[in-house]
């Protein structure tokens, strides 16, 4: 059987009891490494799980899935995912492949950023469509996701922005030349995402458009949600462009405009100080 097991968001101990029991009896255990990361390394997980882990990067999962599914019809294989197993379409594809091969599967869920963002006090049922913000390059600066942000705000809905992760990525030159040389990992921060959003706002004004988001739009930055050093900051988009929330992983919420009094009271716990020097490093659980 193929087991898809969510690991939660914090550290090794965030796996469920059910998930841990399954991991310890599986013949092979894969750890997906490209859609998210935990705050602890592979060795810490192996020690707690009492099992050796096989790292599965994007290429392994998307192009060589048969290796993962090998013998899963006669033995138990675990595929571990940070957060919840269905946080990426790749994982659904793995289940479809297993089903076509006659391999049974079972999913063991866990917390993901999609529901854990409620820790900032914004009500989950008031979130609209989630968007992804990717690292811009000199030749690729996508803005199309901003239409979804606009639609959400028109409907009074908050927008969760998932920020880019670059793990085991090749440069264009190495990709063209077929060289297996990979760039250092990069994780987009809240301030980087806010800076790109501010540029989109300016671009829209230059084109004569009325931007759905401005420098004064209320936003919430979150870092390492679920970890002991989790941080949350609430402030304007302009303030988000300079706030320092520390190491990865980060997420950004663009509020829908009209807030419930309880939402406003909760966000007041995380408000960025007016003093810019104090606003550089924000805490708060």
Curated annotation (Swiss-Prot):
Catalysed transformations (reactions): 2-[(3S)-amino-3-carboxypropyl]-L-histidyl-[translation elongation factor 2] + 4 S-adenosyl-L-methionine = diphthine methyl ester-[translation elongation factor 2] + 4 S-adenosyl-L-homocysteine + 3 H(+)
Molecular functions per Gene Ontology: diphthine methyl ester synthase activity
GO biological process: methylation; protein histidyl modification to diphthamide
Gene Ontology cellular-component annotations: cytosol
Keyword tags: Methyltransferase, Phosphoprotein, S-adenosyl-L-methionine, Transferase
Function: S-adenosyl-L-methionine-dependent methyltransferase that catalyzes four methylations of the modified target histidine residue in translation elongation factor 2 (EF-2), to form an intermediate called diphthine methyl ester. The four successive methylation reactions represent the second step of diphthamide biosynthesis.
NCBIfam families linked: dph5
Name of the featured protein: Diphthine methyl ester synthase
Organism expressing this protein natively: Bos taurus (Bovine)
Gene: DPH5
């Amino acid at each position: 059987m193929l087991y898809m097991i969510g690991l939660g968001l914090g550290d090794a101990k965030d796996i469920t009891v059910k998930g841990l029991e399954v991991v310890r009896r599986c013949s092979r255990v894969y750890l997906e490494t490209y859609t998210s990361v935990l705050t602890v390394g592979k060795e810490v997980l192996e020690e707690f799980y009492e099992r050796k882990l096989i790292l599965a990067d994007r290429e392994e999962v998307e192009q060589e899935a048969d290796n993962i599914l090998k013998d899963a019809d006669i033995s138990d294989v675990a595929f571990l995912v940070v957060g919840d197993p269905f946080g990426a379409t790749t994982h659904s594809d793995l289940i479809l492949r297993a089903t076509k091969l006659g391999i049974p599967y079972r999913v063991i869920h866990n917390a993901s950023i999609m529901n854990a963002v409620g820790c900032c006090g914004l009500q989950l049922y008031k979130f609209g469509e989630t968007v992804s913000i990717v690292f811009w390059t000199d030749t690729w600066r996508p803005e199309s996701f901003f239409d979804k942000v606009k639609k959400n705000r028109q409907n009074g809905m908050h927008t969760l922005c998932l920020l880019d992760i670059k793990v085991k990525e090749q440069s264009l030159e190495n990709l063209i030349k077929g060289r297996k040389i990979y760039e250092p990992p990069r994780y987009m921060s809240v301030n980087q995402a806010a800076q790109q959003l501010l540029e989109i706002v300016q671009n829209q004004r230059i084109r004569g458009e009325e931007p759905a988001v401005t420098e004064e739009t209320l936003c919430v930055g979150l870092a390492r949600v679920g970890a002991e050093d989790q941080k949350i900051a609430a402030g304007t988009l302009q303030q988000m462009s300079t706030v320092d929330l520390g190491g990865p992983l980060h997420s950004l919420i663009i509020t829908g405009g009209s807030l419930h009094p309880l939402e406003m009271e909760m966000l007041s716990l995380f408000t960025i100080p007016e003093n810019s020097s104090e606003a550089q490093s924000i805490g708060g659980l």
